[in-house]
Amino acid sequence: MCERAARLCRAGAHRLLREPPPQGRALGGLLRWVGARMGEPRAPLVPDIPSADPGPGPAASRGGTAVILDIFRRADKNDDGKLSLEEFQLFFADGVLNEKELEGLFHTIDSDNTNHVDTKELCDYFVEHMGDYEDVLASLETLNHSVLKAMGYTKKVYEGGSNVDQFVTRFLLKETANQIQSLLSSVESAVEAIEEQTSQIRQDHCKPSHAVNESRYGGPTPPYIPNHKLVAPEPMKSLPVATGEPKEDGLEGQISRLAELIGRLESKTLSFDLQQRLSDEEGTNMHLQLVRQEMAVCPEQLSEFLDSLRQYLRSTAEERNCFHVAAVRMADGLTFVIYEFWETEEEWKRHLQSPVCKAFRHVKVDTLSQPEALSQISVPAAWCTSGRD
């Protein structure tokens, strides 16, 4: 199916490129000049590198390197041409490799021991492991330029072509989109299969710990009504609690305690008075994993970030092992803090592999003005148990 779609896509692109430009009617030579300018490729992915520079290694002559370089440039948040360990972990964290493994990979790529890797060095490393994906990425480079030319041609036809010319161009454009979407669906299916397999492997490794956690809880985690509204509270002000009728007695008190805890975290006055709040006789030796993400957003990317954040909060709140998730928008309007309560650290790491988390991570790479600040801490589960004062 993929080969047939690729052949049809290439045939359609060739037909579209071989189609002679329509004769100008109303604007004559001026229209043809504008159409030709629109048909020129824009912002090529291959960077302008002086020919005298031989490049760092064999990657310079390999196909697909331009796409990889373009991807890695997105991870370079401060545009200094290199990635720090924090930027590296933020961009590549997927819940499969832990922090130590990512750090080890970082130092492997950092062959000159400078505690940073430049995008070219990173590209060279991945090129050596591309395999058959070299042809795929090289084709993407060609497709990128071909699509840009086709869009310019389409604009020219619609400005000066006949109804028949417009009909043919419209048909070719839609069919090209269908064929590309068919290829994309095949790739997405492969991605989903790999993610499902990876998630199952990690779940099998973590089964003993989950059994202990369930027995200590004495039952499943109490349900709650998630709050899907993103608000902008004043500084040092806790989040509003979820609305709606609680499903169990004591649920409203749970959410109130969580909101109070978040408020204390935001004002940086959190203290653990275990003698006052907990006692071993009550079986309070179980903990929840609290994950805190602080993000500074670029002003021009704020709208895109907010849309993705709302989707992330909705999806995360529906996960069974996420006890609570909430977000705070700080007074400057561009700083956001997300708090997530997970049953175990392994559940949170498994969440990092989910499609919604990966999608949100890619949006953060494009919209944040600096790498996010991520921290985690164990919180006594008794604070979130019904019937506790």
From Swiss-Prot:
Domain ABM span(s) in chain numbering: 289-377
Residues bound to Ca(2+) 1: 76, 78, 80, 82, 87
Gene name as annotated: Necab2
SUPFAM superfamilies for this protein: Dimeric alpha+beta barrel (SSF54909), EF-hand (SSF47473)
Binding locations of Ca(2+) 2: 110, 112, 114, 116, 121
Modified residues (Asymmetric dimethylarginine): 42
Keyword Repeat: yes
Key words of the record: Calcium, Cell membrane, Cell projection, Coiled coil, Cytoplasm, Membrane, Metal-binding, Methylation, Repeat
Induction: Up-regulated by PAX6.
Family matches, as CDD domains: EFh
Location(s) in or outside the cell: Cytoplasm; Cell projection, Dendrite; Cell projection, Axon; Cell membrane
Pfam families with a match to the protein in the record: ABM, EF-hand_7
GO cellular component, one term: presynapse
Protein's name in the database: N-terminal EF-hand calcium-binding protein 2
Keyword Coiled coil carried by entry: yes
GO molecular function: A2A adenosine receptor binding; calcium ion binding; type 5 metabotropic glutamate receptor binding
InterPro entries: ABM_dom, Dimeric_a/b-barrel, EF-hand-dom_pair, EF_Hand_1_Ca_BS, EF_hand_dom, NECAB1/2/3
Tissue: Expressed in the iris, in the ciliary margin of the retina and in the inner portion of the neural retina. Expressed in the spinal dorsal horn with especially strong expression in lamina IIi; found in excitory synaptic boutons (at protein level).
Superkingdom, taxonomy of origin: Eukaryota
Coiled coil (residue ranges): 173-198
PROSITE patterns per UniProt: ABM (PS51725), EF_HAND_1 (PS00018), EF_HAND_2 (PS50222)
Residues bearing the modification Omega-N-methylarginine: 10
Main localization category: cytoplasm
Subunit structure: Interacts (calcium-dependent) with ADORA2A and GRM5.
